[in-house]
Amino acid sequence: MITFNEFLRKVDETFASHQGKNKWRYGQTIMNVLWQTWPQKYKEIQGSDFDCFYDNSTVRLTLAKLEKEWYI
């Protein structure tokens, strides 16, 4: 598994690569990369106050939760 910092790097790289015609929101990118990296945590967060897929205003809360609970 990857570290939290590696996760953030992957989020940033993925976000940058999806800024063409079909732009992704940052929260959407976090959740997509989380699904690939830690599906169990994605399912736990999905639909909660920490789900930033559709709401970028929760990105900071989501990242703080993930950093606190990261398993490596």
Write out the residue ranges for each language-model feature.
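C-terminal alpha-helical interaction appendages
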Residues: M1-I72
